[in-house]
Regions:
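Adenosine-phosphate binding glycine-rich loop
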Residues: 17, 30-154
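N-terminal low-complexity segments that are often proline-rich with Ser/Thr-Pro
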Residues: 153-166
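A structured beta-alpha segment of the ubiquitous adenosine-cofactor-binding alpha/beta core
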Residues: 1-27
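Metal-centered catalytic cores of metalloenzymes
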Residues: 4-9, 28-36, 44, 162-164
């Protein structure tokens, strides 16, 4: 913050993975000036909102931590599943399951962003896609719970049938 640290170097891809707000607007400006093409968060909110907007508006492909950082949570869930079933998976089995989960996350956020034409700086807005996909998942779970009283649904059986406006 302020001194740029690792963000001062010319790179194609930047991966902020440490502390919250570690990549600020000045760092973002330096990355853009040095030609960065993509920033992918590997932690919870390591990029300030101002820096995120600057990167996106300047054509940098930005993938936020909601999606990109989901691997840690997914692996924890796999470990809990493995432990509850008293199983012992190999590294390759866990890695394969995690790969499938991450591919599904990417497909979901990419699809959501495309369905709502969410782009910024000429790139797919994966931050918006992750927010939309997460919202739809919550809506679908809520709808599943409401089937006991369908008059609240107005005919919708999934989030895809609701009129969601952004």
């Amino acid at each position: 913050n302020g001194e740029h640290g690792v963000w001062q170097y010319k790179v194609d891809l930047a991966l902020p993975c440490a502390t919250q707000n570690e990549l600020d607007i000045e760092d973002a400006k330096m990355l853009v000036a040095n030609g960065v093409t993509s920033v992918t968060e590997g932690a919870n909110m390591p990029t300030t909102l101002e820096a995120t907007k600057y990167l996106q508006e300047n054509g940098v492909l930005f993938v936020g931590g909601k999606a990109a950082n989901a691997g840690g949570v997914a692996t924890s869930a796999l470990e809990m599943s493995q432990n509850s079933e008293r199983l012992s998976w190999t590294f390759e089995e866990v890695d394969g399951k995690l790969k499938g989960i991450m591919e599904t996350i990417y497909a979901n956020i990419s699809d959501a962003a495309k369905r709502y034409n969410m782009t910024v700086g000429g790139n797919t807005d994966y931050v918006a896609g992750a927010n939309i996909a997460g919202f739809e998942k919550v809506v679908d779970a809520m709808l599943a719970q409401v089937f006991a009283n369908p008059k609240h649904l107005a005919g919708a059986t999934s989030s895809n049938q609701l009129d969601i406006r952004l």
